[in-house]
Amino acid sequence: MKEYQVYLERARSRQQDFLYPLIFREYIYGLAYSHNWNRSIFVENGGYDDKYSLLNVKRLITRMYQQNHLIISTNDSNKNPFWGYNKNFYSQTISEGFAIVVEIPFFLQLSSSLEEAEIIKSYKNVRSIHSIFPFLEDKFTYLNYVSDIRIPYPIHLEILVQILRYWVKDAPFFHLLRLFLYHFSNWNRFITTKKSISTFSKSNPRLFLFLYNFYVCEYESIFLFLRNKSSHLRLKSFSVFLERIFFYAKREHLVEVFAKDFSYPLPFFKDPNIHYVRYQGKCILASKNVPFLMNKWKHYFIHLWQCFFDVWSQPRTININQLSEHSFQLLGYFSNVRLNRSVVRSQMLQNTFLIEIVSKKLDIIVPIIPLIRSLAKAKFCNVLGHPISKPVWADSSDFDIIERFLRICRNLSHYYNGSSKKKSLYRIKYILRLSCIKTLACKHKSTVRAFLKRSGSEELLEEFFTEEEEILSLIFPRDSFTLHRFYRNRIWYLDILFSNDLVNDE
């Protein structure tokens, strides 16, 4: 954040807060490269190839200076010397530059908003995606109905650019951004298909995620404004998760913009017990009241997307279910509310009564089938969950092979320790353990039994099962009963900023 502020102040002194000149600054690409190199990824540590060097970036910037971007047509893109060579590398490099430049003012706005709201000290804990689950455990046990909503994709990338134009007033920057999107995302089509958007998001993840998250931020801001107009209660629990998208600075602006259009009380049905949670492109809407009110909110969502963002959404794709009978998937977990029934005997004078007590508990379960499917796709097992060797890792040393498998097990245990039932997690770790043994046996051209008997690797491979207990023993007293009780219960970690890579393969 401090690096962003230094670079922005340097640009302000030259161009009075315009973003366009920053595209041609070499240090912007160096900052983008450093950001991605240091970013932690769960399953494997990633990085750029050797082609991404500051020398190549400098040549690219020089070539960009020599081109007249406003007169290049899409038909001439293959003939033009700037676009004609190593198109994928240019696309990735320029998109990183666009993303880092457009993020700078919003990072500064977020920082100032958090300081004004006096929540900067707790902001790091709020950033954890696992902070959502304690909220679910606290609130959802008192609710009755839930709606699992998939936020629709815009049919055209121009919608994302138009939303961004309300906040950034720099015409040359948007001209260059449109030129880039025209050449690298087939934007000359009237409707951008979901497949082409998916391809663009994979090749340019940072830029696409910024544009898409900004679109979701706009929709949530308007939705929260309408929600506040429909109820006299303040949504304290609702604002906790919106702190991550600089909502405090936007709320006052939205009130000014929509005050004229919504000067009278909105004809909404009062629903003070509605709760909303979102991560990535999926949101959960839950309420305690009758399904009729949930159905009203469903239509508000659809009309909001269609009227304000020109995004089409089918009403039949949004279902309303009873929370006790429906499981919803969020952040790689299956969650549902389980009813626990117990009978209590009560005696009054000479009469005895049996009272049935029904309590609710939120079950958060590891989805075993999607995880096995992800492991099969990564070649750790087959589609039935039977472990197989990983021949592509056979060239590494024994220590590196074991360390790779341990890293995956460690990350899965870290991510799924909040599960109500750990049996599925143990099965995943067992698959990875046998896959590791088979990989080592394949490397030494031996059978599994002969390899273990010859090398005596049983003690080393026991780390797959003992490492988690060693970590917990450092936190809790070394009492067997206490450690066993905490090991079976849920443990949420407030330092998880990214979902596991195996979780995203749904």
Curated annotation (Swiss-Prot):
One of its GO terms (cellular component) is chloroplast. Belongs to the intron maturase 2 family. MatK subfamily. The keyword Chloroplast applies. This is Maturase K. Its main location: plastid. GO terms for biological process: mRNA processing; RNA splicing; tRNA processing. It is found in: Plastid, Chloroplast. GO terms for molecular function: RNA binding. Usually encoded in the trnK tRNA gene intron. Probably assists in splicing its own and other chloroplast group II introns. Keywords: Chloroplast, mRNA processing, Plastid, RNA-binding, tRNA processing. InterPro entries: Domain_X, Maturase_MatK, Maturase_MatK_N. The gene is matK.
